[in-house]
From Swiss-Prot:
Organism, scientific name: Staphylococcus aureus (strain bovine RF122 / ET3-1)
Keywords of this entry: ATP-binding, Cell membrane, Kinase, Membrane, Nucleotide-binding, Phosphoprotein, Transferase, Transmembrane, Transmembrane helix, Two-component regulatory system
Catalysed reactions listed for this entry: ATP + protein L-histidine = ADP + protein N-phospho-L-histidine
Protein name: Sensor protein kinase HptS
Pfam families on file: HATPase_c (PF02518), His_kinase (PF06580)
GO cellular component, one term: plasma membrane
Residues that span the membrane, as ranges: 20-40, 222-242
Domain of life: Bacteria
Ranges of residues in domain Histidine kinase: 297-513
Role noted for this protein: Member of the two-component regulatory system HptS/HptR that regulates genes involved in hexose phosphate transport system in response to changes in extracellular phosphate sources. May act as a sensor protein kinase which is autophosphorylated at a histidine residue and transfers its phosphate group to the conserved aspartic acid residue in the regulatory domain of HptS. In turn, HptS antagonizes CcpA-dependent transcription of a subset of CcpA-regulated genes involved in antibiotic susceptibility.
Subcellular location(s) per record: Cell membrane
Enzyme class at the top of the EC tree: transferase
Ranges in coiled-coil conformation: none
Length: 518
């Protein structure tokens, strides 16, 4: 029985495909969905933050513009050469600055005067010039510049969401940045990969506020996660393959057992009933196999018994068909001898009784070759009484050959055929030569009788294959059919003859089956 188990392999592949690949697809879909949702949320957050920051800056700008408009007349009455007016101006400007939701610095510059709240002397080049205004004072006109260093909202966005702010002009020159990776005054070149950003217009000068986020760290985290997932997937594949193989073995164990039992049943080695290890619907198939095997065995035994009986009947029938004409002729001879030579008639009766005892023996269909030869000698002796000792019988055989076992009445028909068809007015010499070779007994029966013509020889050869009960020609046909029944195709019978030269019959009997009582 072949060791290849395609059903187990198919089941293992199916289990593997139905468990590992769905898990893998779920993980991949989950990861892609996670990043898609993450990108969508970040875009939404950036959009919200940039709009909030724009509103905050617009509010500051509006507050400053309102302040300038409201205090324009009062500034014209102040003289910045006067110490008290300078203090009043500082107080108003600081009040404006402190009211705004941003870190602002102002610079008020004019003739021989410079006022600022940048007491720490921070570099205003790193700040965004929020607005510029000309203020008229009593003694002269001054320039007011307001710088934005930061806003609480931008700081909160930077801290909580790691989103950074840029302000650029219409030529994309960076005017403000709360990220050290950008330098004020340089061109802003947005990155195509690893960054998310959104911009809005701030003022009539076409300055734009840009909120952006660097997602390289998230991508690196994603790559790390992918590596971890790949390792987990490899382990999952190995575990899944082993699990699928074990599960396939468990699921197909009973099926393989049933296939093995079918193989044993086919070779008639099934044995007694044994249930399957697992209680399942397959037990019905298992029961059916044993029932079918038992029915098949009973049928085979019945057929074998019938065949044996048929062979016995055929052999008996064949053996009986050898006798009638011989018995009739012998009885006529005895009748003739009773009046002519009672003593010789008594001898013939004794020989005939021994022959009948031999041929009617029912306990076995096999005999020693020596017994068959004795039977033939008695048969020839009776025939010589009829034909005035015209028949000369010569037997050439070794002692070893004489003790071999053959089927009963396997040689007598050859002698009967030689006497019946070879005898003429002259004497008839019959030679029986027995030799052993390769577990076969080779029998050569040669006579110097009248022989056969080519057409007659062809007819006799063809008649050997006729059915034993259909042909009218007994003798060799019966012997050939009996040999086929008892020995099968291993037995061989060949006939050679020439007109007026005699007949030679070569007969091969397998000794390996001759010892079997059929």
């Amino acid at each position: 029985m072949t060791a290849y188990k395609p059903y187990r392999h198919q089941l293992r592949r199916s289990l593997f495909a139905s468990t590992i690949f769905p898990v893998f697809l779920v993980i991949i879909i989950g990861l892609v969905s996670f990043y898609a949702i993450y990108i969508w949320i970040e875009h939404r957050t950036i959009h919200q933050h940039v709009n909030e920051s724009q509103s905050s800056l617009h509010h500051i700008e509006k507050q400053i513009q309102t302040f300038i408009t409201q205090h324009n007349n009062s500034f014209q009455e102040l003289d910045l050469t006067n110490h008290h007016d300078v203090t009043a101006t500082k107080r108003e400007l600081l009040k404006l600055i402190h009211q705004q939701p941003a870190t602002l610095y102002y610079e008020l510059s004019g003739p021989n005067q410079f006022i600022t709240n940048n007491y720490e002397h921070l570099n205003t080049k790193n700040m965004y010039l929020f607005s510029t205004h000309q203020l008229k004072f009593k003694n002269s006109t001054y320039m007011l510049k307001i710088y934005m260093a930061n806003t609480p909202r931008l700081s909160e966005i930077k801290k909580d969401s790691r989103q950074f702010a840029l302000i650029v002009d219409r030529y994309d020159n960076i005017l403000y940045a709360n990220d050290d990776r950008f330098t004020i005054g340089e061109k802003y070149r947005p990155q195509q990969f690893g960054f998310m950003n959104e911009s809005v217009k701030l003022n009539h000068a076409n300055h734009r506020l840009i909120i952006y986020k660097d997602i390289h760290e998230n991508i690196e985290d994603g790559i790390t996660l992918l590596i971890v997932m790949a390792v987990v997937l490899v382990l999952l594949v190995i575990f899944g393959f082993i699990s699928a193989d074990n599960m396939a073995k468990r699921q197909t164990k009973d099926i393989e057992t049933i296939i093995q039992k079918i193989y044993y049943a086919k070779n008639r080695h099934l044995g007694t009933y044994t249930p399957l290890k697992n209680n399942s619907e397959l037990e019905e198939i298992n029961n059916y196999i044993y029932d079918l095997f038992e029915s098949n065995e009973q049928l085979i035994h019945s057929i074998e018994h019938t065949e044996r009986r048929l062979r016995d009947i055929q052999l008996k029938e064949i053996e009986r068909q050898f006798q009638p004409h011989f018995l009739f002729n012998t009885m006529q001879t005895i009748q003739y001898l009773i009046t002519l030579s009672p003593k010789l008639a008594q001898t013939v009766v004794q020989q005939l009784s021994q022959m009948l005892r031999y041929s009617l023996r029912t306990n076995s269909h096999t005999v020693e070759l020596n017994e068959e030869l004795n039977y033939i000698e008695q048969y020839v002796a009776i025939q010589n009484i009829r034909f005035d000792d015209m028949i000369k019988l010569h037997i050439e055989s070794s002692e070893e050959a004489r003790h071999q076992t053959i089927g009963k009445m396997m040689l007598q028909p050859l002698i009967e055929n030689a006497i019946k068809h070879g005898r003429d007015t002259e004497s008839l010499d019959i030679t029986i030569r027995l030799t052993l070779a390769r577990q076969n007994l080779h029998v050569l029966v040669c006579d110097n009788g009248i022989g056969m013509s080519s057409s007659r020889l062809q007819y006799v050869r063809q008649s050997l294959n006729n059915d034993v009960f259909d042909t009218k020609h007994l003798g060799l046909n019966h012997l050939h059919n009996k040999a086929m029944i008892q020995y099968g195709s291993h037995a061989r019978l060949h006939i050679f003859s020439k007109r007026n030269l005699g007949t030679l019959i070569c007969y091969k009997i397998p000794l390996s089956r001759g010892n079997v009582d059929v």
